[in-house]
Amino acid sequence: MTMTDPIADFLTRLRNANSAYHDEVSLPHSKLKANIAQILKNEGYISDFRTEDARVGKSLVIQLKYGPSRERSIAGLRRVSKPGLRVYAKSTNLPRVLGGLGVAIISTSSGLLTDRQAARQGVGGEVLAYVW
C-alpha cells in the first residue's frame, strides 16, 4: 500500500518510539527522511542514525537520545505542511518555534535547512515540521 504522507509517518514513528522510551526506531529509508534525521542529529535531538540494507529495501535506523535520568530530548514534533494544505514561508517571515528553543525544518531551494540556517542564507521555502 502506498503511503500518502511519508514525512508524517516518519514523525509519528519517532514520536511513538520516543514516548515509549525505545532506544532506536526503524523506518523505511528515503533521502528526505535521511536529511531530516541529519538535521535532528545536528541540533542534538537524536544521538545517531544509520542506513541498513535489507533484502526488501533500505531502512533508516534512528538512535534516540535521552538524558541521564531518561528524560526525553524531543519534547514534541508537529507536521506543518501537509499534502492537503501546503505551508510556505518567505525569508522575511520564517517561523520561530518556542521563541527559538525549538527548530523548524524548512525545504528550500538549497536543500533542507533549519529556520536559523534559512534566515542566515536569506531563503524561504516549505515549512515541513516543528521540533522542540
Swiss-Prot record:
The keyword Ribosomal protein applies. GO terms for cellular component: ribonucleoprotein complex; ribosome. Keywords: Ribonucleoprotein, Ribosomal protein, RNA-binding, rRNA-binding. The keyword Repeat does not apply. Pfam families: Ribosomal_S8 (PF00410). Belongs to the universal ribosomal protein uS8 family. Part of the 30S ribosomal subunit. Contacts proteins S5 and S12. One of the primary rRNA binding proteins, it binds directly to 16S rRNA central domain where it helps coordinate assembly of the platform of the 30S subunit. This is Small ribosomal subunit protein uS8. The gene is rpsH.
